Amino acid sequence: MMDSMIIGKYVPGTSLVHRLDPRTKLITIFLFVCIVFLANNVQTYALLGLFTIGVVSLTRVPFSFLMKGLKPIIWIVLFTFLLHILMTHEGPIIFQIGFFKVYEGGLVQGIFISLRFVYLILITTLLTLTTTPIEITDGMEQLLNPLKKLKLPVHELALMMSISLRFIPTLMEETDKIMKAQMARGVDFTSGPVKERVKAIVPLLVPLFVSAFKRAEELAVAMEARGYQGGEGRTKYRKLVWTGKDTSVIVSLIVLAALLFFLRA
């Protein structure tokens, strides 16, 4: 499962999405998160699905690779689906076994919410797959620039969020290594009662925290060795340039939002 985690990883490429301004991608994610909540029927979710598939194809990232990244969250999606089936009692009963009843409203809502979750995960994952940590930092810093008037450390906030994203796959790899080392010593993480499996995770947490702090210290030393002193006076090797392609992407999102609004039930 740890090998399936792709959030935070960068896949080099020359696709249209790779070449977009990072600010465009960050704005796109923010708008998409808002747009997703406009969907409330088959037509709107189908339109969102077509948009998501279109974006995935433009990145040229193998679809099988993205599906592999969904494995860690498949249980959350299934739990969400089952929760809506059990808790939503709307519409006619379409299936019944004893006291267990499945209502049409519960089934529909379960499918819709699960699709919404998958769409959001796919689109947000594409940010790190097509954008380097430096580009994410620069993009966030530019978008948060107005907050400098409030004396907020914009560069430091952007850098902190970028490092957090970058460290997700690193921590997953460390967790995988520690789990394999513990399993070689006879620890079983996959079988037995839930209580026993929870106990087995405790010895995993201590070395993981130690490793995380060690890596954070190494990163801090490396930044100091390179003369990093915050955002003030920092120069950039590449400046962000907004092009017509970026404007077209934002316009297409606005059109998508308008279509979803008119297709709403």
UniProtKB/Swiss-Prot annotation:
It is a multi-pass membrane protein. The chain crosses the membrane at residues 29-49, 50-70, 73-93, 107-127, 152-172, 243-263. Disruption phenotype: Abolishes riboflavin uptake, cell growth less inhibited by roseoflavin, a toxic riboflavin analog. The keyword Transmembrane helix applies. Pfam families: CbiQ. It is found in: Cell membrane. GO terms for molecular function: transmembrane transporter activity. Signal peptide: none annotated. InterPro entries: ABC/ECF_trnsptr_transmembrane, EcfT. GO terms for cellular component: plasma membrane. It comes from the Bacteria. Its main location: membrane. Keywords: Cell membrane, Membrane, Transmembrane, Transmembrane helix, Transport. Belongs to the energy-coupling factor EcfT family. Transmembrane (T) component of an energy-coupling factor (ECF) ABC-transporter complex. Unlike classic ABC transporters this ECF transporter provides the energy necessary to transport a number of different substrates. Involved in riboflavin transport. Forms a stable energy-coupling factor (ECF) transporter complex composed of 2 membrane-embedded substrate-binding proteins (S component), 2 ATP-binding proteins (A component) and 2 transmembrane proteins (T component). May be able to interact with more than 1 S component at a time. This is Energy-coupling factor transporter transmembrane protein EcfT. The lineage of its organism: Bacteria, Bacillati, Bacillota, Bacilli, Bacillales. The gene is ecfT.
